[in-house]
Design a protein with these regions (language model features):
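Phosphate/NTP-binding elements of NTP-utilizing enzymes
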Residues: 1-268
Length: 268
C-alpha cells in the first residue's frame, strides 16, 4: 500500500487477501477523505458478495462514534454513500461520473472469459478515474493474451529496467505463494523432480524455502496438477506458463518419462 502508484497491476497467487485489503482502504477513503471509490468483480454475484462480506461488514463493526460522525446517506446492496459525499460502489463495470479510486478484482479472469467486458472496463471505468486517482488491477494469471497479460508484461519490463514511471505507466507488483506464512505444513518426502525444482529456485532466484513450505507446495500440486504454477506461481514468469498445446496426456507422459517407464519397443 505504501508503494502504491497511480496505476498498479498486481500479479499474485491465490488467496492472499488483497481484495479484502482494498475493500477496507476504499471504505477508509470514502469515510475520512470523501473519495468516490468503485470495485469491479467479474460477476455481479461476486461483486455483491464482496460488498456484503468485506465493505459492509467492516462498516457495521466500526465504533458507533465514527458511524454517527459520517452517517450513511444512501444504502443499497451495491453502494454506500456517506453524508460527506464519499462513496463505495461495487459492480461489473462503471461508466459515467468521476472516481478517485478504482479496483478491478481478478482482471485476468475477466480478460480471458469476458473480453468485451474487459474492453468496456478499459474504455469506461478507467477513463472515469481522475488524473490524481488510483487504479489497481489484481489477479491470478489467465493465459498469455489480453489487457492483464499485456499490462503485467510491460510493467515488469519497466521495473527491471528501473524506468522512471509517469502517471500513465503501470507499476508492477508480484506476490508469490511462498510469501504467505500460512502456506506451510508438516514436512514430508518429496519426489526428485520437486527437489530439483526447489534447488533451481534457490540457485537462480535466491528463493530459499523451508521443508514445510515445500511440503505444502507438493500437497497442493497433487490437486492442481498442471494448473499449480498458474494459481501459485513462485516467480512471475511461471504465472503465464501454458501446458503443451494439443497434448492431451502431457502430464501423464511427463510422469512416465520421469519414472523411466517409456522404453524401446519390445520384440514380438
Amino acid at each position: 500500500y505504501k508503494q502504491e502508484w497511480h496505476k498498479n497491476v498486481i500479479l499474485k497467487a491465490r488467496q492472499l487477501g488483497f481484495t479484502t485489503e482494498v475493500c477496507i482502504v476504499q471504505l477508509d477513503c470514502a469515510l475520512f477523505e470523501s473519495k468516490k471509490c468503485a470495485l469491479i468483480a467479474h460477476t455481479l454475484h461476486d461483486a455483491k458478495r464482496l460488498f456484503r462480506e468485506k465493505t459492509k461488514f467492516a462498516y457495521d463493526n466500526l465504533p458507533e462514534v465514527i458511524r454517527l460522525a459520517n452517517p450513511i446517506k444512501i444504502e443499497t446492496k451495491e453502494e454506500l454513500v456517506f453524508s460527506n459525499g464519499g462513496s463505495v460502489t461495487v459492480s461489473t463495470s462503471f461508466r459515467g461520473g468521476t472516481l478517485q479510486r478504482l479496483h478491478v478484482s481478478e482482471f485476468g479472469k475477466i480478460c480471458a472469459k469476458y473480453p468485451e467486458k474487459a474492453r468496456e472496463i478499459v474504455s469506461g471505468a478507467f477513463q472515469a478515474v481522475n488524473d490524481e486517482g488510483v487504479i489497481t488491477l489484481e489477479s491470478t494469471a489467465e493465459g498469455r493474451q489480453g489487457y492483464f497479460f499485456d499490462y503485467s508484461q510491460q510493467a515488469e519490463k519497466d521495473q527491471l529496467a528501473n524506468k522512471e514511471l509517469t502517471a500513465q505507466d503501470w507499476r508492477f507488483f508480484f506476490f508469490s505463494w511462498w510469501q504467505n506464512p500460512e502456506y506451510s505444513m508438516t514436512a514430508q518426502a518429496l519426489p526428485d523432480r520437486l527437489i530439483a525444482y526447489f534447488e533451481k529456485l534457490q540457485a537462480k532466484h535466491g528463493i530459499t524455502l523451508t521443508d514445510e513450505q515445500k511440503s505444502w507446495y507438493y500437497s497442493k500440486e497433487k490437486t492442481l496438477g498442471d494448473d499449480m504454477k498458474r494459481e501459485y506461481p513462485s516467480i512471475p514468469s511461471e504465472a503465464f506458463e501454458q501446458s503443451i498445446e494439443g497434448a492431451y496426456y502431457a502430464q501423464q507422459f511427463n510422469y512416465l518419462y520421469t519414472q523411466n517407464r517409456i522404453v524401446e519397443s519390445l520384440p514380438n
